[in-house]
């Protein structure tokens, strides 16, 4: 076997007359990766188009704003090719706000349930759950759902629901009579 090839395989192309043939690593490419809160929460596969190429990307669950997802070998041309660096940008969510690992949202509670207590349905990033409303719950009260927040290195954060009391927009005559009776009883007591 040719000794020149043998030494190039052992020590690289820079020895024994291989100068100038050394290849360079391709440049890393940076691109923005906009994600919904649900996509960032659950993770999964996503196909993105960067520089005219479609690339399949694995998104880890619980990825954060500003995190960088590296896709090896999908950057600029070279030997070896550079990497593709995708910088995560979380899109605004219509319901939830993320702070650290905790999520915040508003929970609409009908007035009768706020007064006497009961159960209402609340949304989480994993789907709906039933929340127990204690009697005489005031507007603005924060209810904490442990472990229903965002995943992170120290486990899951919490979901904080701020109570917003709602009153019915339409009443049947019977319901209106009951509300009037309730108002009379309240004013008689005051």
State the predicted function of each range.
Residues 1-190:
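Non-catalytic interaction modules of co-chaperones and other macromolecular assembly/maintenance factors
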């Amino acid at each position: 076997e040719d000794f020149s090839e043998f030494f190039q395989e052992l020590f690289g192309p820079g020895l024994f007359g291989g100068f100038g043939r050394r290849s360079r690593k391709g440049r890393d490419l940076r691109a923005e990766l906009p994600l919904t809160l649900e996509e960032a929460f659950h993770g999964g596969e996503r196909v993105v188009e960067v520089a005219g190429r479609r690339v399949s990307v694995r998104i880890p669950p619980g990825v954060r704003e500003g995190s960088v997802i590296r896709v090896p070998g999908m950057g600029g041309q070279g030997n070896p090719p550079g990497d593709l660096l995708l910088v995560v940008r979380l899109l605004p969510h219509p319901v939830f706000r993320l702070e650290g690992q905790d999520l915040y949202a508003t929970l609409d509670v009908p007035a009768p349930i706020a007064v006497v207590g009961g159960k209402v349905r609340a949304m989480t990033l994993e789907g709906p759950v039933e929340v127990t409303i204690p009697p005489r719950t005031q507007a603005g009260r924060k209810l904490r759902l442990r472990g229903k927040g965002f995943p992170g290195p120290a486990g899951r954060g919490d979901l904080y629901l701020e109570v917003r009391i709602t009153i019915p927009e339409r009443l049947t005559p019977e319901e209106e009579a009951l509300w009037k009776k309730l108002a009379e009883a309240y004013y008689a007591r005051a």
